[in-house]
A protein has these predicted regions:
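Alpha-helical transmembrane segments of multi-pass inner-membrane proteins
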Residues: 20-24, 74-77, 102, 115-144, ...
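Hydrophobic core segments of transmembrane alpha-helices in multi-pass, intramembrane catalytic enzymes
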Residues: 34-45, 91-104, 157-173, 206-217, ...
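Membrane-interface catalytic loops of GT-C/OST-like multi-pass glycosylation enzymes that act
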Residues: 87-92, 146, 153-156, 201-206, ...
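Long extracytoplasmic/lumenal interhelical loops at the membrane interface
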Residues: 145-146, 259-273, 277, 281, ...
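Hydrophobic transmembrane alpha-helices and their immediate junctions
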Residues: 219, 226-228, 322-365
Length: 423
């Protein structure tokens, strides 16, 4: 495998990679440190762009993914302009949809050396594994009144959503021979840590999501190796047996379909009914981007006890805040990512496309049915980070000839070491 050519300012690129890695490692530990690292990364990116703006080149595949997200961003503009507080909506638009996306842009534009990409992913898997293991410490020491592990961040569902991305990635890295040894070593720890985290976090939504995405991500590898299939089945049955032998887990599983006495489920349904009324009142552009909290009290049912801060559903929340226009943009964006990644994987079997598919399916579509994952800052940054790294790793293999081009661009049409494009 060869390294993707990158701009001549090699030290700046190295510092940029370090800043991004540091940002991802402290993302759920210190907001201040994360924002500082992000600011430094953006500054380095601007310097690199200014010095190399005439020679920067992206693959057609990455451009297409970026354009699809751009369509979604455009669909949000009407809900900003017609909001009862356009300034607040504009601020929310930048913070929620632009600033969190920056990490994707920085990686796909500037981090083109496979060594850096592998190091970034290795560091991310290692830190997240430690956080997942920390949930066991929380449980054993009764650190939370609800008896659940939240990791380094107080948001329980946030960690649950992240693990829905983490487990498929780690398992595929372990099973696919393309990945480097040190990445596989971190993946071993990551699989173990995530399984512990899933048990200690006790997110029912995460359990159900993993039942969908893990088989999809690992199917081709398990089909080829019966020993591997038996090992995975043994681990699954062992975990299932442990859960069924524990009254607290049995109760947790049984509560999945309880929509009456389980307030978590019942309040979500009431909030969704409120959203239905919101959409009826403002069907085209919604109540305004980022204006849910201000408007929800007018629509909230008295029976809803938790005073939810969002709709706990990606599609319903976007429909309420951004109307049919915003929902259509979201469906196009997600549909494009799912269709393109699955189509590319079927054409040329590789770990990168199937992981892009399962990450988007699991985090946004499935876990996003019970939580507003699009609004979770650390979760979305991790999603964009993972997608960018995976797509860039795929590019390194495309340029080495191991994966045929999905875009029709030949290897002769890529930048050389100086950043110049040769055709």
């Amino acid at each position: 495998m060869i390294d993707l050519p990158y701009p001549e300012d090699r030290k700046l690129v190295k510092y940029l990679a370090f800043s991004i890695g540091f940002m991802m490692c402290v993302l759920r530990i210190s907001t201040a440190a994360m924002q500082m690292a992000c600011g430094i990364a953006v500054l380095l990116g601007l310097i690199l762009w200014h010095k190399n703006r005439d020679t920067i080149a992206l693959s057609e595949e990455i451009k297409a993914y970026m354009k699809a997200y751009g369509v979604f961003l455009l669909s949000l503009i009407p809900s900003i302009l017609l909001s009862d507080s356009p300034a607040t909506s504009l601020k929310g638009f930048f913070n929620e949809w632009i600033w969190r996306y920056v990490v994707f842009i920085l990686i796909v534009v500037f981090i083109k050396r496979r060594e850096y990409l592998v190091n970034l992913l290795t560091a991310y898997l290692t830190v997240m594994s430690v956080e997942c293991m920390f949930t066991l410490v929380e449980i054993m020491n009764h650190m939370r009144p609800d008896g659940r592990g939240a990791g380094f961040n107080r948001m329980v569902l946030s960690l649950g959503g992240i693990m829905c991305m983490l487990l498929p990635v780690a398992m595929v890295i372990l099973m696919d021979s393309r990945f480097e040894k040190k990445l596989k070593q971190s993946a071993v720890f990551s699989v173990a840590g995530t399984l512990v985290g899933l048990l200690c976090n006790k997110s029912r939504g995460a359990w159900l999501t993993e039942l969908f995405v893990v088989p999809i991500a690992t199917f081709q590898y398990l089909k080829q190796n019966k020993k591997r299939m038996l090992a995975v089945a043994a681990v699954f049955l062992g975990i299932l047996g442990f859960m069924l032998s524990s009254p607290q887990y049995v109760q947790r599983i049984e509560s999945i379909t309880n929509t009456t006495t389980d307030r978590s489920n019942a309040d979500r349904i009431l909030a969704w009914k409120s959203a239905e009324i919101m959409v009826r009142d403002r069907p085209v552009t919604g109540i305004g981007l980022g204006r849910f909290r201000e408007h929800y009290q007018k629509y909230r049912f008295k029976e809803e006890k938790q005073d939810l801060g969002h709709m706990h559903n990606n599609f319903i929340h976007i429909a309420a805040e951004n109307g049919i226009v915003g929902l259509a943009g979201l469906l196009y964006f997600i549909g494009f990512y799912l269709y393109t990644s699955l189509r590319n994987h079927r054409k040329n079997k590789n770990p990168y496309d199937i992981l892009v598919f399962t990450i988007c399916l699991g985090y946004i579509c499935i876990f996003g049915q019970i939580d507003y994952t699009l609004g979770v800052s650390d979760g979305m940054r991790m999603l964009w980070f993972l997608l960018a790294v995976l797509l860039q790793l795929k590019e390194t293999e495309r340029l080495s000839g191991e994966i045929p081009s999905a875009s029709g661009i030949s290897v002769a049409e890529i930048p050389d070491g100086s950043g110049l494009v040769h055709r």
